[in-house]
Amino acid sequence: SEGGHPEDSINCIVMAPTRELAQQIDQQMEGFSYFMPVSSVAVYGGNDGVLFEQQKRGLTLGADVVIATPGRLIAHLSLGYVDLSRVSYFILDEADRMLDMGFYDDIMQIVKFLPKERQTIMFSATMPAKIQQLAQNILHNPAEVKLAVSKPAEKIVQAAYICLSLIHI
């Protein structure tokens, strides 16, 4: 694969607290990577055995990006066929929500499978003590970026333009 990363290994893990968010991230990933040689697999719970087998196949073949919920990724890890030793990027989306849902121990269990040398990114709307504790445990020399809302959402104008001709004058 490009960038020196082996094709049969997982390069990036994006953790999401819910199946719905994992599906949404996966859909966006498919859109972003449409014209690029980037593969992704979404790994989330459900009662579908076929889905579990599809996820297993994606994990064992090696996807560039794995989008996963903590519980389902641990289920696959516990079966012993998932290799996370070459993960370069570990991303926690909505980390505060994951902790609110009781996933702290699951996240720490997943981290044990990851290489020490990796980039970890944590997104959180809030920074309560438990998020700060998680950050201390899994981040090394972190940089904190705080974003303030610059405009109320209702003041943002969204527009779509339709080009009636491909000829530029």
For the regions a language model picked out, list residue spans one by one:
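SF2 DExD/H RNA helicase N-terminal ATP-binding lobe
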Residues: S1-L166
